[in-house]
Design a protein with these regions (language model features):
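Glycine-rich phosphate-binding loop
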Residues: 30, 34
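Short hydrophobic clusters on alpha-helical segments that form packing/core surfaces
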Residues: 43-47, 55, 66
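Acetyl-CoA-dependent GNAT
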Residues: 1-29, 40-42, 46, 50, ...
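Conserved catalytic-core motifs of GNAT/GCN5-like acyltransferases
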Residues: 56-58, 71-92
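Short glycine/proline-centered loop/turn elements that form peptide/ligand docking sites
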Residues: 36, 40, 62-66, 83-88
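Exposed loop/turn and edge beta-strand positions of beta-sandwich/beta-sheet ligand-binding modules
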Residues: 20, 53, 88
């Protein structure tokens, strides 16, 4: 039995009617088991309950796995930050429009 073990975490902040995901990660041992999907679905529902219009994030263009994950939740690429990361890779700016009540 594992106690007090973090499987995944999402750090985000709200500005006006938008939320920005700053950090979203699932422990490698627990990937492909639905935890990331659960966490993202939970975040989206919470943001919609807060009547937020958009959910935003940045992801490295070279992180194909993360890009595929975000596309499953209908995040679209709305911009690019060239040479954003230390290795020179670009950051893709992603946005998901939310359903407000």
């Amino acid at each position: 039995m594992i106690t007090n073990f973090v499987i995944g975490i999402c750090v985000f902040h709200v500005v006006l009617d938008e939320a920005q995901i700053n950090y979203f990660v699932v422990n490698k041992k627990f990937r492909k088991k639905g935890f990331g999907t659960y966490l993202m679905s939970y975040l989206i529902k919470k943001c919609e309950k807060l009547n937020l219009r958009k959910l935003l994030l940045e992801v490295s263009q070279s992180n194909v796995t993360a890009e595929r994950f975000y596309s499953r939740f209908d995040f679209s690429t709305v911009g690019i930050r060239k040479n954003y990361y230390k290795d020179g890779s670009h950051a893709l700016l992603k946005e998901k429009k939310l359903t407000t009540k």
